[in-house]
């Protein structure tokens, strides 16, 4: 429960109800702080709002309102805060509070088509805000966050990825991944086949790369982060050698692929195959993969 004290007159508390089966997740990327309940598209959200008055005190206001908001913040553009979703309920008409009050509230079948996201330059957050309207003296507000995750239907078509790449007369390889769409706890299975090897290879690695694009115009930014470096071969291979690939995605901090969310941001993922020779030259081939959510949490 969250609480804020306003002077010596009153304090307010805001709580989202969650049953014993409700899953929770950290709001922050560093997995610190409090965990928040996870909801999905169309699910009801309910809770309580409490205004506690000190004995003998009264409190004038111009209405008490509860709002449920979906908001996108572009962190490198402080002016670019966008509420893509908002619904509100009036809890109390203008007047005086002369005693403490508790309000039970509920938002039914809430449309939550976008997932919560906390990236490098973008935040998509959902929260409930208690708003006590005070006129010229400034409103009193309290917010509490919750997380939205949405399950996906397994893709009907999931083709393998197969490519031949190389450097003329020096290196020619064929690589294959078992599919192009993976759930967040999936395993990437594949192989790398060396058709021609005329350079001395030091090692080969497989990287998972996340690319976040956000903003428009002069505020458009692209952030690329390498989430993992997984060595799959040490030493130089011979012609016709086949190197197996098995990469477990569950060990990485991944989200589903997000495409042009509210025309504000996108998140894509890539598998990057990198070969390093003995002179530290790097040869790579990047291939996009599609990620989707199979389970909550």
Swiss-Prot record:
The keyword Transmembrane does not apply. One of its GO terms (biological process) is retrograde transport, endosome to Golgi. Keywords: Protein transport, Transport. GO terms for cellular component: cytosol; endosome; retromer complex. Belongs to the VPS26 family. Component of the retromer complex, composed of VPS26, VPS29 and VPS35. As part of the retromer complex, interacts with the sorting receptor SORTLR/sortilin. Interacts with GTPase RAB7. Plays a role in vesicular protein sorting. Component of the membrane-associated retromer complex which is essential in endosome-to-Golgi retrograde transport. This is Vacuolar protein sorting-associated protein 26. It comes from Plasmodium falciparum (isolate 3D7). The gene is VPS26.
